[in-house]
Amino acid sequence: MKVGVLSFQGGVIEHLNQIRALGHTGVEVKKEKDLDDIDAIILPGGESTTIGKLLKITGLIKSLKEKIESGLPTWGTCAGMILLANEVEGQEEKYLQLMDIKVKRNAFGTQIDSFKTHKVIEKISKDEMELVFIRAPYITEVKDNVRILCKVDDKIVAARQDNIIVTSFHPELTNDVTFLNYFLKSKWMK
C-alpha cells in the first residue's frame, strides 16, 4: 500500500517511519502530482495556519480536497484535524472543511501544557495506548454522521466520518503503531 504524508511540517518523518515499519510505502506529498497513485493520506501535526497557507499557495488544497471527497482514506492528526474540520472556534479562515466537526485550537493549553496519558480505545484495540498531546485541539461539536472514537477528560479527541479519521493526539510520536494499523486496515482500504 502507498501512503502519502502531507509534508510541509510536523511529524512527517515519524509517520513515514511507522508506515514503513508496517511494510507499506510511505511518500511525501508536497505538490499535486504527489497525490497520484496513493492509497491513503495522513495530514500530520504542525501549525495549522501555516500548513493551510501552504496548501493554498501551492494550489494543493483543491486537488487534495477533491481526492478526499472522492473517498481517499484520510487521517488528520492535531493540525490535520483542524484542517479537516468544517468549523474552528474563533477562526474565520477555512481550509478543507470535509468533516462535520467543530474544533477548538490549542484547547488543552500551550506548549508547556502538553501531556501524555494512557487509554484503552475500545473501538481500536483492547490494549492500552499512549496518547501524546502537544498544544492539542479537541472537538467541541459533532454532527450525527460523525462517530466518536475516544474522549479524554470528557473531551472528544478522536473521531471518524466516512473515509476520514482525526485525532487530537500524536500516535506517530510513540512506538505504538496500533492506531496507524487501524487506519490502514479499515474497511474502506483496497
UniProtKB/Swiss-Prot annotation:
A Gene Ontology cellular-component term: glutaminase complex
Any GO BP annotation: pyridoxine metabolic process
Keywords: Glutamine amidotransferase, Hydrolase, Lyase, Pyridoxal phosphate
Record's catalysed reaction(s): aldehydo-D-ribose 5-phosphate + D-glyceraldehyde 3-phosphate + L-glutamine = pyridoxal 5'-phosphate + L-glutamate + phosphate + 3 H2O + H(+); L-glutamine + H2O = L-glutamate + NH4(+)
Function: Catalyzes the hydrolysis of glutamine to glutamate and ammonia as part of the biosynthesis of pyridoxal 5'-phosphate. The resulting ammonia molecule is channeled to the active site of PdxS.
Family classification: Belongs to the glutaminase PdxT/SNO family.
Enzyme Commission no: 4.3.3.6, 3.5.1.2
InterPro entries: Class_I_gatase-like (IPR029062), PdxT/SNO (IPR002161), PdxT/SNO_CS (IPR021196)
Membrane-crossing segments per the record: none
Species whose genome carries this gene: Clostridium beijerinckii (strain ATCC 51743 / NCIMB 8052)
Residues bound to L-glutamine: G46, E47, S48, R105, I134, R135
Gene Ontology molecular function, alphabetical: glutaminase activity; pyridoxal 5'-phosphate synthase (glutamine hydrolysing) activity
Designated gene of the protein: pdxT
Protein name, as recorded: Pyridoxal 5'-phosphate synthase subunit PdxT
Active-site residue list: C78, H170, E172
UniProt pathway annotation: Cofactor biosynthesis; pyridoxal 5'-phosphate biosynthesis
